[in-house]
Every structure is written in structure tokens, then in C-alpha cells.
Design a protein with these regions (language model features):
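N-terminal Rossmann-like NAD(P)+-binding subdomain of aldehyde/semialdehyde dehydrogenases
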Residues: 1-122
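Conserved small-residue-rich beta-alpha loop and adjacent elements
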Residues: 106-172
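Short internal beta-strands
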Residues: 152-162, 266-273, 279, 350
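Conserved NAD(P)+-binding/catalytic subdomain of aldehyde/semialdehyde dehydrogenases
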Residues: 178-249, 253-265
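A conserved active-site cap/scaffold subdomain adjacent to cofactor or substrate pockets
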Residues: 230-302, 306
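C-terminal core of ALDH-fold dehydrogenases
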Residues: 321-390
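Glycine-rich beta-alpha loop elements in corrinoid/cobalamin-binding modules
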Residues: 391-456
Length: 456
């Protein structure tokens, strides 16, 4: 196992040319997902059955998981695993409760009322992947923020195992998170069903959750017809390690990411070739014991990169260019560098904060931007499950009181050539001014008549 290595010279910038990223999907996946979506839109449940048998090798008659199966799963799961899931759920719920935003309204000095109304989405579909591993944690990380946001209908779709059933831990996680609408279907066909509906599955407003290249391609294709959280590519970690870091801990943290997927990307940013050699050597021992050694080795060989820097400033700039999904700072005084880190999905500070803690029980969401998208996007949060609407209220008096503001509308709209925009305000102002003048004239006339009546 050998990771690719780059030794930067003093003041040499790290650029995106050094990064060899694998995209979320390829043209072949996009073409296949297009055909699958069309088939599901045309044939509904029949397409889901045919595609599930084709790709998963099992025949499913009823996709909906019955309530008794969900209840039974709670008894089937190892008690320690069940308690761990409950503990994780409590932490995740607590963290996301702190993200909730309230509607607000503000009465300006000119009398207008403006505000923002926060409303939960009506329905959300959560994709929970299968394949190389089973992910009950994905259920918690997607369902609990939606639940905290107030989403009434939360749907889970996940592919069947080889015997046509679902992992009991995934069902237990659904139960813990309050999800009762669960379907045994995966792949691009599940995304299509969530987006457009079938005889069995009603469509949702938004789809969240990670998946393989075909799922990512399907999410891209349905985006716009429904909302999506993000298009997630292969997972990635970047570890910045100085001479105070234990090479064994750095090594196992790189492996913890590499074991996800042969396409997972692992970056080590350090300050000497000797330390880089020590980390690579430290990988060899646990690799021999790993139950996912082949996946881990392929990931590190094909998508591993060591960047040897000459200064911390150079290292942090490399981090910002990589914009990793996960960033671990195995350096002395890690908190001091937080302000210099602009681009990362999640930041793990210090040697005692491994990524695995964030993946499961710390509370922050593990659904994170990948492939450099941390430059402009954020982790999944309660905000992903609400809508915010702007609220405006003007009265007749407001239009007169801040007439300059309304006349500014006329001025800008006229400049932009939008005649009806300008006219819609000008008509209102004219009507109000005419009414005010009529009222003034009426008052004056009444005053004259009153004076004549008194003989003045």
C-alpha cells in the first residue's frame, strides 16, 4: 500500500491540479438512471418489482414494511446496539433542536410590517443505502432533523438484503426516529418513486440521503421536480498532523475513511517525509486485521494523497483548496487554527476527536458536502427541512407616509422597462393622493359653509 505523495516547496501554492477526484456519477450512471426513472414513471409499482428483481436479485410483492415487522425489529437487534442507537438519537436530536429558527416580524418606523415565516416541509423521503454496508446511522441523521423541523410525513426507502428483508437495525433506527412509512426498494428506482409516486408510494417534497452513483445521478435528474439535499460523491477525509500526533491514530483514522468505498479519498497533510513514512508504516499492521482490507487498500492506493508542507499556513491553504468532507486537526493547539479554515464539511479538533465520533454519536450531522463542495455548501441541518417565506404588509397610510419609497419603485421599474410594475404602484399613489386632495377640499368647503351659516 503506497499513497501518492507531493512535497511542496516553500511558498509553493497547493492547487486543485494536485487533486484527482472521482465525481459523484459518470455518464453511464446518468444514462442508466434516466432510463430507470422513465420506466418507473410509466409503469409504477410494476417497474419497481422488475428493477428490484433485476438489481437486487429478490422478488418483492409488497414494498411497504408492516408495522409489526418494525416492532419486531426492536427485539431482534442486539440490546447493546439498540442502546447505542438510542444514545446517538438523543445526541443528534439535542444538537438539531439548537438549529431551529422561529418566524419573525418587524414593524418599521414607516409603518410597514416585514418578516419571515418558517414552515416545515410537508413530506420528505430519506434514502438509506445498502450494498457494502448497512447504515442505521443514516436513518437517524436524516430523519431526526426532519422530525425536529416539524415535517409530518417522513418516508424511508432502502434496498433489500439478499433474502428480501431489511436489516433489523435500520428498522429499529426508523422506530427510534419515529419513521413508520418504510419501503423495501433502493437504487435510482426508489428515487424515482419518491419524486413522482407509484400506486404504492406517494411522492414527497424533498429527497435526502446518500447513495451510489446511480442514486446520485437519479437525484440530479429529479432535482427541480422535487428538492434534494445534495449530490454526494465518494466520502473523504483530510488529516493535518504535526510531529506531536501519534502516527498510529492518524493511520487508523485514514483507514476509517478508506474502508467506506474503493473510491473514498484520503488526504494526509503533514510537515516531513519521515512522519509521512511513519504513518504509511503504521497502516500496514491494522490493515492485516481489517475485515475490509481490500476496499481500504484500493482506496488508499488509488485515491490516497500525502501533502508534505513547509509551514502551517501552507498546510491550511492546502486544506482550503481540498475543501474536504471531514477534516481532522491532529496538531498542537488545534483550536487556534479554526479561524483559518474556510472550507470543510465538518472539523474535528485535536487527537481525541476522531471522525467516527462525529459519524455516530456526537450530534452534528454526518451528511456532509463532498467533492470540494464544502467551498459553498453546508452539512444537512434543520434548515433543509423548512421553507422560509418573506412577508410584507403595507397600508394606505404607509404608501402616503413613505411615498418616496414607492416612487423609488416607479423609478427603478421604469429604468428596467417594466411598465406594469411601475404602473401598479403609480396607480395606487394617484388614487390615494386624489382621495387625500378630495378630503382636504371637502373639509375646506365644509369650513366655508359653516362660516357662512354663522354669518362670518
Amino acid at each position: 500500500m503506497t499513497m501518492r505523495r507531493i512535497d511542496l516547496q516553500p511558498l509553493e501554492p497547493f492547487t486543485s491540479d494536485f487533486i484527482d477526484r472521482t465525481g459523484a456519477f459518470n455518464p453511464g450512471a446518468l444514462e442508466a438512471a434516466t432510463a430507470i426513472i422513465e420506466q418507473v414513471r410509466r409503469d409504477g409499482d410494476a417497474a419497481l418489482r422488475a428493477l428490484t428483481e433485476k438489481f437486487d436479485g429478490v422478488a418483492i410483492e409488497n414494498f411497504r414494511v408492516p408495522g409489526e415487522a418494525i416492532d419486531a425489529a426492536m427485539a431482534e437487534v442486539d440490546p447493546d446496539t439498540l442502546e447505542a442507537l438510542k444514545h446517538a438519537a438523543a445526541q443528534i436530536r439535542d444538537f438539531h433542536e439548537r438549529q431551529k429558527q422561529q418566524s419573525w416580524f418587524f414593524a418599521r418606523e414607516d409603518g410597514a410590517i416585514v418578516g419571515s415565516k418558517v414552515t416545515p416541509l410537508e413530506s420528505v423521503g430519506i434514502y438509506v443505502p445498502g450494498g457494502r454496508a448497512l447504515y442505521p446511522s443514516t436513518v437517524l441523521m436524516n430523519a431526526l432533523p426532519a422530525q425536529v423541523a416539524g415535517v409530518e410525513r417522513i418516508v424511508c426507502v432502502t434496498p433489500p438484503t439478499k433474502d428480501g428483508t431489511l436489516d433489523a437495525a435500520i428498522l429499529a433506527a426508523c422506530k427510534i426516529a419515529g419513521v413508520t412509512e418504510i419501503y423495501t426498494v433502493g437504487g435510482a428506482q426508489a428515487v424515482a418513486a419518491l419524486a413522482y409516486g407509484t400506486e404504492t408510494i406517494r411522492p414527497v417534497a424533498k429527497i435526502t440521503g446518500p447513495g451510489n452513483a446511480f442514486v446520485a445521478a437519479a437525484k440530479k435528474l429529479v432535482s427541480g421536480d422535487v428538492g434534494i439535499d445534495m449530490i454526494a460523491g465518494p466520502s473523504e477525509v483530510c488529516v493535518v498532523a504535526d510531529e506531536t500526533a501519534d502516527p498510529r491514530l492518524v493511520a487508523i483514522d485514514l483507514m476509517a475513511q478508506a474502508e467506506h468505498d474503493p473510491l473514498a479519498a484520503c488526504y494526509l497533510v503533514t510537515f516531513s517525509d519521515a512522519y509521512a513514512d511513519a504513518v504509511e508504516a503504521a497502516i500496514q499492521v491494522p490493515l492485516a486485521d481489517s475485515t475490509r482490507a481490500d476496499i481500504t487498500r484500493t482506496s488508499l492506493d488509488d485515491h490516497g494523497l500525502i501533502v508534505v508542507c513547509t509551514s502551517m499556513d501552507q498546510a491550511l491553504e492546502a486544506v482550503n483548496v481540498i475543501a474536504p468532507e471531514h477534516l481532522e486537526m491532529h496538531v498542537e493547539g488545534a483550536m487556534e487554527y479554526l479561524g483559518a479554515i474556510r472550507n470543510a464539511g465538518a472539523i474535528f479538533l485535536g487527537a481525541w476527536t476522531p471522525e467516527a465520533v462525529g459519524d455516530y454519536v456526537a450530534g452534528p450531522n454526518h451528511t456532509l458536502p463532498t467533492g470540494g463542495t464544502a467551498r459553498y455548501s453546508s452539512p444537512l441541518s434543520v434548515d433543509d427541512f423548512v421553507k422560509k417565506r418573506s412577508i410584507l404588509l403595507d397600508s394606505q397610510a404607509d404608501l402616503l407616509i413613505y411615498g418616496m419609497g414607492e416612487r423609488a419603485v416607479v423609478q427603478i421599474a421604469t429604468h428596467e422597462g417594466l411598465w406594469a410594475h411601475a404602473r401598479s404602484v403609480a396607480l395606487r399613489l394617484k388614487a390615494l393622493l386624489d382621495a387625500e386632495q378630495a378630503s382636504v377640499a371637502g373639509s375646506a368647503a365644509a369650513g366655508v359653509e359653516d362660516g357662512e351659516a354663522r354669518g362670518e
